[in-house]
């Protein structure tokens, strides 16, 4: 909408993230988006996935360039927050974590369902959920129904220091995103933020996670709609503490997402 209102002879550049262009080809909103974007000099997509999505929706491929989002240098961990995390988690291990809104696309539900079987192998496993959103009550209800109250911890409205400490002290960042209606994970900056602390990720194939995760090297890309695949992927990452090797690789890999590197593009 804002691009439509910009009346100028100056060059216009537009950033696209995924879900805002994910509408049926030929629909009124699709035609409107194509018209607006045709008037821009360049379209910056946040991932290869978003670029391909744009092209499939009829947007001029010659105008689209991929520049991934960047991150700032990782914040130094606060000793007080680290101490609080150790007190909260105690002997709980392995530790899974998601930092995101609680909505269908983020797929917390499937992780919780996989946890039911994982706890048979790893009785001290814990899943840390940080965020808020419309699915919060449903997720808490599911946790109760599956008798996982001891395995799932919910946090919201917490400080950045505590959030970062929880990430740093976790073993695997989990967000096997799916497409929900028109909502799609265009990139997934959370994977990069976790990797800065040496935490590998489980991401979903439906979206731009593959730009942020090297499958089999810095994490695993799976089918977020397939519960068995989520379970087996997590089991693989946990067995023999494979997440340690993946985490080391992830920390090296994401150095290219530092803003001082991204800005060169």
Locations of the language-model features?
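Carbohydrate-associated surface elements
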Residues: 49, 70
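Conserved donor-binding/catalytic core segment of Leloir-type glycosyltransferases
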Residues: 44, 88-106, 112-115
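A short, well-ordered alpha-helix in the C-terminal region of glycosyltransferases
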Residues: 94, 124, 151, 229, ...
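Acidic donor-binding loop of glycosyltransferase active sites
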Residues: 168-183, 199
């Amino acid at each position: 909408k804002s691009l439509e209102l910009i009346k100028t002879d100056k060059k216009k550049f537009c950033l696209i993230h995924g879900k805002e262009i994910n509408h049926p080809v030929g629909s009124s909103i699709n035609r409107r988006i194509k018209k607006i974007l045709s008037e821009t000099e360049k379209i910056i997509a946040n991932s290869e996935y978003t670029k391909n999505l744009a092209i499939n929706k009829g947007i001029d491929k010659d105008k689209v360039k991929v520049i991934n989002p960047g991150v700032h240098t990782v914040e130094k961990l606060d000793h007080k927050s680290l101490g609080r995390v150790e007190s909260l988690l105690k002997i709980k291990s392995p530790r899974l974590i998601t930092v995101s809104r609680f909505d269908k696309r983020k797929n917390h539900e499937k992780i919780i369902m996989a946890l039911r079987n994982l706890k048979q192998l790893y009785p001290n496993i814990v899943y840390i959920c940080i965020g808020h959103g419309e699915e919060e009550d449903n997720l808490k209800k599911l946790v109760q129904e599956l008798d996982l109250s001891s395995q799932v911890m919910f946090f919201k409205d917490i400080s950045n220091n505590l959030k970062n400490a929880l990430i740093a002290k976790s073993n695997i960042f989990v967000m096997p995103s799916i497409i929900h209606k028109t909502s799609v994970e265009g990139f997934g900056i959370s994977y990069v933020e976790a990797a800065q602390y040496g935490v590998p990720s489980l991401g979903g194939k439906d979206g731009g996670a593959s730009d942020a995760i090297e499958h089999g090297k810095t994490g695993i890309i799976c089918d977020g709609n397939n519960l068995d695949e989520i379970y087996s992927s997590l089991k693989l990452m946990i067995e023999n503490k494979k997440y340690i090797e993946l985490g080391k690789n992830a920390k090296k890999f994401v150095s290219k997402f530092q803003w001082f590197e991204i800005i060169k593009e």
